[in-house]
């Protein structure tokens, strides 16, 4: 039995002709960041919340989300055989800059392995090998929490990031804003008759884009601090990286703040955990 047999999970799937609104609802309902896309039970691609977030905020179409099929924005699913070892999976994910791999048995998709699964593997097998500070990302993107949602979303688009830290006037971290937070806002605002004179229960892409980014949209009147997640996880830079994995897994998040002398000094993410395993691979 290979390492992957203990790690991979049965994928949550969606048909390629499913609507974007259905996909968003499934992501939020299951508290996950990606779905495998199928065509008559055969896997044909993958869709992530980051793919959807960037699409919603940059695409020029005026179609409703109910009219857009997931096949229009899905990406190819890279897969490995179920006999592959975890270390080689890590190298593939880093090389291709992807967050998940399909797992094949006899050319049939039997599961999916994600960075969360890799973090679980690290926590179990690499305890005390690395401190958080060894692999953390020193730089992070932040804005003032009093900024409008429009300003913050514009920054996320220009930086092509899915999360941003928000600080108060004393340069202290108050919270974090993610695409998942924006999905909730879009769905709530989309069902409000008073927003942008929108009386259609269906949410259009142009409504979402204009709502967040136009002068007249709700994004220009709502402050980021009103929709941010205030309680976010953090860890000290000198702690065991395995402990950071446990925190991310427990909170179902992809990254946490790293404290240096009591202040946020950077971020450690599941991608950094993959890099730690890469370091181990390179030293063998």
Report the location of each language-model feature.
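Tandem CBS (Bateman) regulatory domains
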Residues: 1-10, 48-78, 90, 114-142, ...
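Short glycine/proline-centered loop/turn elements that form peptide/ligand docking sites
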Residues: 7-11, 20, 43, 76-77, ...
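Short N-terminal helix-initiation segments at or just after the protein's N-terminus
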Residues: 12-22, 41-47, 78-83, 107, ...
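The conserved cystathionine-beta-synthase
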Residues: 13-31, 38, 79-97, 104, ...
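A glycine-centered beta-loop-beta connector
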Residues: 27, 35-50, 93, 101-116, ...
């Amino acid at each position: 039995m290979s390492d992957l047999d203990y790690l991979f999970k049965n994928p949550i799937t969606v048909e390629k002709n499913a609507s974007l609104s259905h996909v968003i609802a499934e992501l939020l309902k299951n508290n996950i960041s990606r779905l495998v896309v199928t065509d008559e039970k055969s896997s044909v691609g993958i869709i992530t919340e980051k793919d959807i977030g960037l699409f919603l905020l940059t695409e020029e179409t005026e179609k409703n989300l109910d009219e857009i099929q997931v096949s229009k924005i899905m990406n190819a699913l890279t897969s490995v055989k179920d006999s592959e070892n975890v270390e080689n999976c890590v190298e593939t994910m880093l090389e291709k800059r992807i967050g998940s791999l399909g797992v094949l048995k006899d050319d049939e998709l039997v599961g999916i392995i994600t960075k969360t699964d890799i973090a679980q593997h690290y926590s179990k097998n690499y305890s005390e090998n690395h401190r958080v500070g060894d692999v953390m990302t020193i730089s992070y993107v932040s804005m003032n929490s009093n900024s409008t949602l429009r300003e913050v979303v514009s920054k996320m688009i220009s930086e092509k990031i899915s999360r941003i830290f928000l600080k108060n006037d004393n340069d202290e971290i108050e919270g974090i804003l993610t695409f998942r937070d924006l999905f909730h806002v879009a769905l709530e605002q989309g069902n409000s008759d008073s927003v942008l004179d929108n009386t259609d229960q269906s949410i259009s892409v142009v409504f979402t884009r204009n709502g967040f980014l136009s002068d007249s949209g709700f994004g220009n009147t709502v402050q980021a601090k009103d929709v941010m997640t205030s309680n976010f996880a953090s860890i000290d830079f000198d702690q065991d990286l395995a402990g950071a994995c446990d925190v991310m897994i427990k909170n179902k998040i992809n990254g946490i703040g790293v404290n240096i002398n009591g202040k946020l000094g950077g971020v450690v993410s599941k991608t950094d955990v993959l890099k730690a395993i890469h370091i181990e691979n390179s030293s063998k």
